Amino acid sequence: MALRTAASEQLIRQQREQRTLVAGLRKKERALKQELKKQQQQADALGRRIQQVIEEEARKAAAAAAAKKKNATQKSTAPSGYLMSKDEEQLSRNFAQNRGKLPTPLSGRYRIIAHFGTQQHPDLKYVKINNQGIDLQTQPGTRARSVFDGVVTSIFVMPGYNTSVIVRHGNYLTIYSNLSTIYVKTGDKVKTGQELGVIYSDPEEDNRTVLHFQIRKETTKLDPELWLKK
């Protein structure tokens, strides 16, 4: 009888511990889902900001062309409406010819922790993530660098992504997000491999250092892994 009672009490304790464990896991899952939702909202906000920058650049280019009608025949129009000079046309062609040959957008070692497009979350079965670029994890102090010759057209700050730098290569654009210290300013011409700034290290996550990188042909999002050299 005593043995049966002890076994029953042990079973009750195990069941209680199991319920506590399950409750804890569910709580962590809810917290993770909330954090992922916040991150996705921040990513969407970044995407909208980039879209606004591209559209504003197109408007400015069109206005400049209208103000100089005598040179209008020397301009060509990209699919989105961005008016390119002859030099920009050539830069676009050069960029396109380097598909699969571009250097990595950072110095030093790295690993890709999030790929382009919609994908299944590794830990949450029914959660999908939509990434407009790729995320590269590296070491603290690593610099982001331009993958091709171009012009810095915009620098801005967004929640969750710190400072972003956009470099235009004709009608192609590369975006470098989650930077802290910035080495360039709007209007600067940059060369392939030129350092743009230091990638932010998060002190609340053991100095986790991640660069978010995008490539676009005007408003069309492209998979950076198809453009970078393997």
What are these regions (language model features)?
Residues 142-145, 182, 188:
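Residue "hotspots" at secondary-structure boundaries inside conserved domains
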Residues 1-84, 88-91:
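Alpha-helical oligomerization segments with coiled-coil/rod-like character
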